[in-house]
Amino acid sequence: MVWKGIYRSGYPSKRNLTFLRTLGLRSILFLCPEDYPDSHLGFLEECGIQLLQFGVVGNKEPFDEIPEDVLRAALDAVLDQTNQPILIHCNQGKHRTGCLVGCLRKVQRWSLVAIFEEYRRFAGSKARVVDQHFIERFQPSAGAARAGALPRALPARA
């Protein structure tokens, strides 16, 4: 759990779908450009879960740019309470998901130290400097923290 009503994971397998059903999800935010598999689309339809897809190509090269406009749009979707409870995922739940969650943490006014600690906890030995630079440079828009987007009592982590 990232925050109440906001979850993260790697790509859910078929065996994970039963657990996902227990979360009462309204939305799944998929951060990859590939088509969602038919088996999963059937599950989403059966459960009334909407698929929000923001296709971010994996950034394995050190100088590949993360598309800020796409991540901003994805962040707006995460912050929209009508989409919650929401699951954010990419293929591994490390890099693309980590960047989006890192941007959310900036909206929540977490310190960079805490944001990077969380990012590295999920990315492990595969942490990417380019992702951390993206998070560091990201400036939340005034609209991102609009009233009602997240509960008023946001924890500020040191």
What are these regions (language model features)?
Residues 1-88, 92, 99-158:
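Cys-dependent protein tyrosine phosphatase-like superfamily
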